[in-house]
Amino acid sequence: MSGTILENLSGRKLSILVASLLLCQVFCFLLGGLYAPLPAGHVTVLGSLCREDHTRQNDTSFLLYSRGAGACIPVSREEVERDPMKMANELVHVFQMPLPRDLRDLDYSRWQQNLIGVLQVEFGYDSTSELREPPKELQLTIDMRLAYRNKGDPDQAWKLYAHGVEQRYLDCVTAHVGPTETLYSCDMIPLFELGALHHSFYLLNLRFPLDTPRQMNLQFGHMHDLTLTAIHQNGGFTQIWLMLKTVLFPFVVGIMIWFWRRVHLLQRSPALLEYMLIYLGGALTFLNLPLEYLSLVVEMPYMLLLSDIRQGIFYAMLLSFWLVFAGEHMLIQDAPNKSTIRSRYWKHLSAVVVGCISLFVFDICERGVQLRNPFYSIWTTPLGAKVAMTFIILAGVSAAIYFLFLCYMIWKVFRNIGDKRTSLPSMSQARRLHYEGLIYRFKFLMLATLLCAALTVAGFIMGQMAEGQWQWNDNVEIQLTSAFLTGVYGMWNIYIFALLILYAPSHKQWPTMHHSDETTQSNENIVASAASEEIEFSHLPSDSNPSEISSLTSFTRKVAFD
């Protein structure tokens, strides 16, 4: 049996490999911590009030903007207060993005990738009104028009991007009680989400139509201040992220080709663990593929959904691999047949598949619909918000349970190894050194796997919470740092890169010896190893089944013949 490179690589070469990979890991953390800005930035825009012509209320091509040639004449709050009807059905709340800085107009860059808008509403009632505490889950109907223009276009050349009349539900509290009016402040509500930030400038017009027969927006007194928070990915972070993907992609592809060629040179069919490794490498390659470069040229509103699908495939493959990886090293070979997914792991992997499919369906229900209507959100209704929050909580709990189960499996592996080590003293010294070295290397690799799993689960839970942080009632702010994101992403690549190297078949072949000559040869190996700093484990003969990927898995069948 030739074994794997993990078994046959000398101690010095293995130390050099591990040190090099650790340096790469440190570099990934430093790259995000020292050079990349925060992953996301935001700008807060206070809405401007404009008054529109009655004759053009239903004209969706008519757009009001607050800056540039032909801008609307702003309406002051005093003018609204003096009007007996508070200018009902005449006011348009205008948000123009991005805001200028230092008297200079700024524009969005395609490197910023996406744009999310959330709105905070304040409305007021006359203090003479009987309403003091507004009821919960107030239904607000909003006429939303989103437009864009590009750099170099005239100021008035706004083009309609999307239009919709949507309902949002508000939970409000009393903000201020004055002698003439009472103000109420409401929780933030999701407004729109763009999967591609392809244009330079964006304009949002909001109308709150009043309709007595349909009881539309009659429970509100009058809108006071509207604040839009526009969240975008930072362009500097995108550049660092894509640079990392561009560098890692060819390395992973190259090591996969090298690994699979070595497997096919053997006189056997690939083992289950080798299949899982190549599948895992394929999922990582799909994740590493820097498709985001295309969004710099072509508008791709489906990029967010595609990114979620790619990451979901990788998560499913990585979680499945860890279960198989731990299971294949249980050192329990009761069945004479080769391990298969269906025979040994279908129960474990079914839970992973069901969980990933559930998250995929949840993602399609929101971001899939947003391809047609960017104003849609599953958070808009009380029931939808509860379902979404339940999904996020269940996803976090499931990830934690998975990690605990993986810890249990690895603990069983370590316990089995400890039980089998009792047979080492009865072996020859050379064979005992052989297996002690393998056990030490294997334990180190399993601990690295556990650390990788812990960071992956932590990143997944934090990512799920960050997506829904605008819905938490306690104003919890969760910011994934660039160092954490680039570090975990680099860790995935380095970990899988190392597995593909260490579990590749070793092609060192040694002549098979009879048992009567083995003790003499073992003693010669011991003398030789004493004069050297490293032990080449591959010098030892083995009577293992040639279909096994590692001699460690056949440890239980070894017989001491000293």
Curated annotation (Swiss-Prot):
Residues 1-13, 261-270, 333-344, 412-441, 504-562 are cytoplasmic. Keywords: Cell membrane, Cell projection, Developmental protein, Endoplasmic reticulum, Endosome, Glycoprotein, Golgi apparatus, Membrane, Postsynaptic cell membrane, Segmentation polarity protein, Synapse, Transmembrane, Transmembrane helix, Wnt signaling pathway. GO terms for cellular component: cell projection; endoplasmic reticulum membrane; endosome membrane; Golgi membrane; neuromuscular junction; plasma membrane; postsynaptic membrane; presynaptic membrane. GO terms for molecular function: Wnt-protein binding. It comes from the Eukaryota. It is found in: Presynaptic cell membrane; Postsynaptic cell membrane; Cell membrane; Endoplasmic reticulum membrane. Residues 539-562 are annotated as: Disordered. Residues 35-239, 292-311, 366-390, 463-482 are lumenal. Glycans are attached at N58. GO terms for biological process: imaginal disc-derived wing margin morphogenesis; intracellular protein transport; positive regulation of protein secretion; positive regulation of Wnt signaling pathway; regulation of intracellular protein transport; segment polarity determination; Wnt protein secretion; Wnt signaling pathway. The chain crosses the membrane at residues 14-34, 240-260, 271-291, 312-332, 345-365, 391-411, 442-462, 483-503. It is a multi-pass membrane protein. Residues 541-556 have a biased composition (Polar residues). A segment polarity gene required for wingless (wg)-dependent patterning processes, acting in both wg-sending cells and wg-target cells. In non-neuronal cells wls directs wg secretion. The wls traffic loop encompasses the Golgi, the cell surface, an endocytic compartment and a retrograde route leading back to the Golgi, and involves clathrin-mediated endocytosis and the retromer complex (a conserved protein complex consisting of Vps35 and Vps26). In neuronal cells (the larval motorneuron NMJ), the wg signal moves across the synapse via the release of wls-containing exosome-like vesicles. Interacts with wg; in the Golgi. Interacts with Vps35, a component of the retromer complex; wls stability is regulated by Vps35. Belongs to the wntless family. This is Protein wntless. It comes from Drosophila ananassae.
